[in-house]
Swiss-Prot record:
<dbReference type="InterPro" id="IPR018369">
    <property type="entry name" value="Chaprnonin_Cpn10_CS"/>
</dbReference>
<dbReference type="GO" id="GO:0046872">
    <property type="term" value="F:metal ion binding"/>
</dbReference>
<dbReference type="GO" id="GO:0051087">
    <property type="term" value="F:protein-folding chaperone binding"/>
</dbReference>
<dbReference type="GO" id="GO:0005737">
    <property type="term" value="C:cytoplasm"/>
</dbReference>
<dbReference type="InterPro" id="IPR037124">
    <property type="entry name" value="Chaperonin_GroES_sf"/>
</dbReference>
<dbReference type="GO" id="GO:0051082">
    <property type="term" value="F:unfolded protein binding"/>
</dbReference>
<comment type="similarity">
    <text>Belongs to the GroES chaperonin family.</text>
</comment>
<keyword id="KW-0143">Chaperone</keyword>
<dbReference type="InterPro" id="IPR011032">
    <property type="entry name" value="GroES-like_sf"/>
</dbReference>
<dbReference type="Pfam" id="PF00166">
    <property type="entry name" value="Cpn10"/>
</dbReference>
<dbReference type="InterPro" id="IPR020818">
    <property type="entry name" value="Chaperonin_GroES"/>
</dbReference>
<protein>
    <recommendedName>
        <fullName>Co-chaperonin GroES</fullName>
    </recommendedName>
</protein>
<comment type="subunit">
    <text>Heptamer of 7 subunits arranged in a ring. Interacts with the chaperonin GroEL.</text>
</comment>
<dbReference type="GO" id="GO:0005524">
    <property type="term" value="F:ATP binding"/>
</dbReference>
<keyword id="KW-0963">Cytoplasm</keyword>
<comment type="function">
    <text>Together with the chaperonin GroEL, plays an essential role in assisting protein folding. The GroEL-GroES system forms a nano-cage that allows encapsulation of the non-native substrate proteins and provides a physical environment optimized to promote and accelerate protein folding. GroES binds to the apical surface of the GroEL ring, thereby capping the opening of the GroEL channel.</text>
</comment>
<dbReference type="GO" id="GO:0051085">
    <property type="term" value="P:chaperone cofactor-dependent protein refolding"/>
</dbReference>
């Protein structure tokens, strides 16, 4: 299935969190928090300003981003969990 976000929305695939702590302890699945970073899979054209002009998106396909763990709406594409969120929900681009 192919999904194209509209306006200022972004399709993000969550990146799995680490399974081991810095001290070498393994974290069970029940104790893991939802990852708050992911890879941008698709972006919309941008937000429309009051004067009708489209404001270009800052993020682009392939960017790794940081977002609030409660951001976006969860969708399942081809059996894989993704998020559709507004660009404003993205806190930073990880470089």
């Amino acid at each position: 299935m192919n999904l194209k976000p509209l306006n200022d929305r972004v399709l993000v695939k969550r990146l799995e969190s680490e399974e081991k702590t810095a001290g070498g302890l393994y974290i069970p699945d029940t104790a893991k928090e939802k990852p708050s970073r992911g890879e941008v899979i698709a972006v919309g054209p941008g937000k429309t300003a009051d004067d009708g002009k489209v404001i270009a998106m800052t993020v682009k396909t392939g960017d790794v981003v940081l977002f609030n763990k409660y951001a976006g709406t969860e969708v399942k594409l081809d059996g894989v969990d993704h998020l559709v969120m507004r660009e404003d929900d993205i806190l930073a681009i990880i470089q």
